[in-house]
Amino acid sequence: MATIAQLIRHDRKDKFKKSKSPALMYTYNSLKKKRTYNPSPYKRGVCTRVGTMTPKKPNSALRKYAKVKLTNGYEVLAYIPGEGHNLQEHSVVLIEGGRVKDLPGVRYHIVRGTLDTSGVEKRRQQRSGYGAKRPKEKKE
C-alpha cells in the first residue's frame, strides 16, 4: 500500500476500462490503409460461415451463430437470435454489441429484420427485438 508521502507526490491512476465489443470501436480507411477510432452502435458485415454451436456446461442446445467479416476488417462471431433464420454464406448483416453468456467468443448479436436478415416469423410478443412486423387484425 502506498504511503501518504507517495500519494502526495503521485495520484492514484484510474484503471483503464476495456471495451466489451472492440470490433464496434474502429472504422477502416482504405485510402490510408489504417483503422481509425470511430465508435458506432452497429457495423455491417458479410457472413463467411453460418452454423450451430453447443453452449457451456450446465446448458444444452444448438445455438445458431454466424462468422461475420465486418467493413472495418475485423472477423467476429455473432449470435442469430430467434427461431429460424434465412442467413447463409455471403449474406449481408448488421451486428450490434451484446454477448451470449453460454457461448465462448460470441460477443455480438445480429440485428433481425435489416439488410439480408428477415424478421422472426409468427412472432407476437417482444417483436421489436426480432424485426417482426405487427400482425394484421382480422376484420369481422
UniProtKB/Swiss-Prot annotation:
InterPro entries: NA-bd_OB-fold, Ribosomal_uS12, Ribosomal_uS12_bac. It holds the Pfam family Ribosom_S12_S23. Gene3D superfamilies: Nucleic acid-binding proteins. It comes from the Bacteria. GO terms for cellular component: small ribosomal subunit. SUPFAM superfamilies: Nucleic acid-binding proteins (SSF50249). GO terms for biological process: translation. The keyword tRNA-binding applies. Residues 36-56, 117-140 are annotated as: Disordered. With S4 and S5 plays an important role in translational accuracy. Interacts with and stabilizes bases of the 16S rRNA that are involved in tRNA selection in the A site and with the mRNA backbone. Located at the interface of the 30S and 50S subunits, it traverses the body of the 30S subunit contacting proteins on the other side and probably holding the rRNA structure together. The combined cluster of proteins S8, S12 and S17 appears to hold together the shoulder and platform of the 30S subunit. Part of the 30S ribosomal subunit. Contacts proteins S8 and S17. May interact with IF1 in the 30S initiation complex. Belongs to the universal ribosomal protein uS12 family. This is Small ribosomal subunit protein uS12. It comes from Malacoplasma penetrans (strain HF-2). The lineage of its organism: Bacteria, Bacillati, Mycoplasmatota, Mycoplasmoidales, Mycoplasmoidaceae. The gene is rpsL.
